[in-house]
From Swiss-Prot:
Cysteine pairings via disulfide bonds: none
EC assignment: 2.5.1.7
Protein name: UDP-N-acetylglucosamine 1-carboxyvinyltransferase
Subcellular localization(s) per the UniProt record: Cytoplasm
Modification sites for 2-(S-cysteinyl)pyruvic acid O-phosphothioketal: C115
UniProt superkingdom: Bacteria
Binding of UDP-N-acetyl-alpha-D-glucosamine, residues: R91, D305, I327
Primary subcellular site in the record, as a coarse category: cytoplasm
Gene3D superfamilies: Enolpyruvate transferase domain (3.65.10.10)
A Pfam family reported for this protein in Swiss-Prot or TrEMBL: EPSP_synthase
InterPro entries hit by this protein: Enolpyruvate_Tfrase_dom, Enolpyruvate_Tfrase_sf, MurA_subfamily, RNA3'P_cycl/enolpyr_Trfase_a/b, UDP_GlcNAc_COvinyl_MurA
Enzyme category, top tier: transferase
Reactions it catalyzes: phosphoenolpyruvate + UDP-N-acetyl-alpha-D-glucosamine = UDP-N-acetyl-3-O-(1-carboxyvinyl)-alpha-D-glucosamine + phosphate
Source organism of the structure: Aeromonas hydrophila subsp. hydrophila (strain ATCC 7966 / DSM 30187 / BCRC 13018 / CCUG 14551 / JCM 1027 / KCTC 2358 / NCIMB 9240 / NCTC 8049)
Length: 418
């Protein structure tokens, strides 16, 4: 199993180009199942999860071509089973459910795996599809959906805000008979990107970016080309890296409007922020890092996917900071690893109290999920001595070419093949 070796006490400086957003690319790739014509996608990040999704599409019968961009043709799809062997590694595989049920009237999707950071129930997906006329059974570890004819438009009130739940039902509704209204819908930029992609193929979706979506079903979607939006979480991770190491970096090919809550907190932490249409510069040179209070919540509030990185920021800031996690009940698994490095962090339920740590020390630590692994890498740059981060397959799921990007910023990091 690969690991990272990081030599600490280094400063991140320079420019980095941001990749396409994993959390936008995956649903867009699954949405190609709704269309039988060729689709060309650009700015798709080269990630383990993207590769898994492409394998799954091919297993279902799609033809794909990857040459910097991704071309998908699902006209020959003749299989509606998303097997455990692929789904177990990636929770986003649940996003095959809506498109398969809508276009083919049948979907067997294994109950998903992925990061072990909470219960993430599938009942929201199941209930919404049932309201649209699907008959669903959960048996043998699979969600099995069957539809007589077409799905029917429905009024769906989601019991809780769910990004993948919103995406699955929105995709299914594009080919349903009649109008579907989804209330308490997720507002995340990745949901908006998916809606924009579907509309580019001929879907009729209104309200993306608000908590109410209105989808008028169409008979079919046509092919087309689309560019995936930049990754706001990768952007935020690099910005925090510069903040905690006292450096100055510019993120290129990004979108500052996608992470306003993060930028506000970085300014509170003492960073100087400048931004343009597609770039952000953070300068922490000679400035004192201050702790911040954050509370994760659905967009446009502070994103849960930036919580671990800000836990590191608070651990090395001068003073006491507080991090409250409201999205997932088990998303502080990075804290014991940071404590191994000398961090003074106390957990009280869903709150992490981070007190001023004089100096983190290098240690051997274990990545437990995608964003936790990124936080441990950042901690390694701040620490004195060398840090080994094990189980970095997590980080490969969500960050494209991360060690080379960090090396380009002056980070002393190398991959040790397992």
């Amino acid at each position: 199993m690969d690991k990272f070796k990081i030599d600490g006490r280094c400063t991140l400086n320079g420019e980095v180009t941001i990749s396409g957003a994993k959390n936008a690319a995956l649903p867009i790739l699954f949405a190609t199942l709704l269309c039988d014509e060729e689709i060309h996608l650009s700015n798709v990040p080269r990630l383990k999860d993207v590769g898994t999704t492409i394998k799954l599409l091919e297993m279902l019968g799609a033809t794909t071509k990857v040459n910097g961009n991704v071309t998908v043709l699902t006209g020959a799809v003749n299989n509606h089973v998303a097997p455990y062997e692929l789904v177990k590694t990636m929770r986003a595989s649940i996003l095959a459910l809506g498109p398969l049920a809508a276009r083919f009237g049948a979907a067997d999707v294994s109950l998903p795996g992925g990061c072990a950071i909470g219960a993430r129930p599938v009942n929201l997906h199941v209930h919404g599809l049932e309201l649209m006329g699907a008959k669903i059974a959960i048996e043998d570890g699979y969600i099995k959906a069957r539809v007589d004819g077409r799905l029917k438009g429905a009024h769906i009130l989601m019991d809780m805000v769910s990004v993948t739940g919103t995406e699955n039902l929105m995709m299914a509704a594009t080919l349903a008979d009649g109008r579907t209204v989804i209330e308490n819908a997720a507002r995340e930029p990745e949901v908006v990107d998916l809606a924009n992609f579907l509309n580019a193929l001929g879907a009729k979706i209104q309200g993306a970016g608000t908590d109410t979506l209105t989808i008028d079903g169409v008979e079919r979607l046509h092919g087309g080309s689309y560019s995936v939006q930049p990754d706001r979480i990768e952007t935020g991770t690099f910005l925090v890296g510069a903040a905690v190491t006292g450096g100055k970096i510019t993120c290129r090919k990004t979108d500052p409007t996608l992470l306003e809550a993060v930028l506000v907190k970085l300014e509170e932490a003492g960073a100087l922020i400048e931004k343009g249409e597609d770039w952000i510069t953070l300068d922490m040179t000679g400035r004192t890092l201050k702790p911040v209070t954050i509370k994760t919540a659905p967009y446009p509030a502070f994103p849960t996917d930036m919580q671990a990185q800000f836990t590191v920021l608070n651990a090395v800031a001068k003073g006491t900071g507080m991090v409250t996690e409201t999205i997932f009940e088990n998303r502080f698994m990075h804290v014991p690893e940071l404590v191994r490095m000398g961090a003074d962090i106390e957990l009280q339920g869903n709150v992490a109290i981070c007190r001023d740590t004089q100096q983190l020390k290098g240690a051997q630590v274990m990545a437990t999920d995608l964003r936790a692994s990124a936080s441990l890498v950042l901690a390694g740059f701040v620490a004195e001595g060398s840090t080994i981060v094990d189980r970095i397959y997590h980080i490969d799921r969500g960050y494209e070419d991360i060690e080379h990007k960090l090396q380009g910023l002056g980070g002393r990091i190398e991959r040790i093949k397992g």
